[in-house]
Amino acid sequence: METLNLFIRSIFIDNMVFAFFFGMCSYIAVSKSVKTALGLGAAVTFVMVMTVPLNYLLNEYVLKANALVEGIDLSFLSFIVFIATIASFTQLVEMAVEKFSPTLYNQLGIFLQLIAVNCAIMGGSLFMQQKVDAGAIGNVWQSIVYGLGSGMGWWLAIVMMAAIREKTAYSHIPAALKGPGIAFIITGLMGIAFMIFSGIKL
C-alpha cells in the first residue's frame, strides 16, 4: 500500500509541473502538438525510470556517509553524480530516437538533448534522496515506482497542455496573451485543479 501511495502521490499530488513547476522550459516549448508531447513525455519518463533507481543505488552504496568507507561522507558529490547519470541516459535516448524515429527526432530538436538538463529529471533524483532520508523510499523497487510515477506525472501534464493548446489555436485569444502567456495561465489553472488530489491518502 505504501508503494501504491508513493506512485499515486508522485503522479497527481507531487506532480513535477503542477506542484513544483519543474521542467517548465521544455513543457512550454514542446507542448504545441500532442504527438510531439507524447514523444518527449515518453523519453523523459524512460530517463526517469532508469536514472532514479540507479541514483538511489549510488546514493545508498557510494555517496551516503559510511557507505564506502567508515567516516567518509560523499553526499556533497550528489549533484555531479546525478547529472552524469542523467546525461549518459539522455545520450542513449537521443541515439535511439534518432535511429528509430527520425521524424520525432527532428520535431523535438534541441529539446531532446536538453533532457539532460531538464530540472524535472534532476528533481526526481533529488526528491528521491530526500524521501530516502525521510523513510518514504526504502528500496530499489520503491525508487523505480517513484521514478515511473514522477515521469508519468510530467508526461500527463505536457500531453494535457498540448491538447488544450491545440484547441486554443482556434480560439480568440488577445494578442498579448498568445503563445507563452496563455500557456502559463492554463498551467496555473491546471495546477489549481490538481490541488483536488492533495487530500488523497491510501
For the regions a language model picked out, list residue spans one by one.
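Generic transmembrane alpha-helix signature in multi-pass membrane proteins
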Residues: F21-A29, E94-F100, F111-L114, C119-G135
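Structural signature of hydrophobic alpha-helical transmembrane segments
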Residues: N5-A19, I72-I86, I144-A157
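Ordered, amphipathic secondary-structure segments that act as subunit-interaction surfaces
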Residues: E60-L108
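Hydrophobic core segments of alpha-helical transmembrane domains in multi-pass membrane transport
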Residues: F22-S26, V44-M50, I83-L92, V117-G124, ...
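Cytoplasmic-side transmembrane-helix entry/capping segments in multi-pass membrane proteins
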Residues: T36-F46, L77-F82, L104-I115, A176-I182
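C-terminal ends of transmembrane helices
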Residues: F22-T36, T90-L104, M161-H172
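Interfacial loop-to-transmembrane junctions
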Residues: E166-I185
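Juxtamembrane transmembrane-helix termini in multi-pass membrane transport proteins
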Residues: N5-F46
